[in-house]
């Protein structure tokens, strides 16, 4: 079970382990662990477009949740994300979310 919270300008992820203990860690730690797992599975193979892969994994759910939070209001969503509305529209189109 995952839950994201804003705490002192740091996104955190809460996890519940098998002993029903809740722990929180910064989202960046989860990204770091996911990348470690990804690299371990590569077995020395070259990879390209890693930046795009990671960005897409984070950007799409970010856009989805912000659009839900703002009830589809693109102006509010763009302000919330700190990007201009045209950029937001381009990103929404990229992920088929328009």
Curated annotation (Swiss-Prot):
Pfam family, one: HTH_8
Protein's UniProt keywords contain Transcription: yes
Signal peptide as annotated in the record: none
Cited PANTHER family: DNA-BINDING PROTEIN FIS (PTHR47918:SF1)
Complex formation: Homodimer.
Function: Activates ribosomal RNA transcription. Plays a direct role in upstream activation of rRNA promoters.
Name of protein: DNA-binding protein Fis
Annotated organism of origin: Pectobacterium atrosepticum (strain SCRI 1043 / ATCC BAA-672) (Erwinia carotovora subsp. atroseptica)
Originating gene: fis
């Amino acid at each position: 079970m995952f839950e994201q919270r804003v705490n002192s300008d740091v996104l955190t992820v809460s996890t519940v382990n098998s002993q029903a203990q809740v722990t929180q860690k910064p989202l960046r730690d989860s990204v770091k662990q996911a990348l470690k797992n990804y690299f371990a599975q590569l077995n020395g193979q070259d990879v390209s477009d890693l930046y795009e892969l990671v960005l897409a994994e984070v950007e799409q759910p970010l856009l989805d949740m912000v659009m839900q939070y703002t009830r589809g209001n693109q102006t509010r969503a763009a302000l919330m994300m700190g990007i201009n509305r045209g950029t937001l529209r381009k990103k929404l189109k990229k992920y088929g979310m328009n």
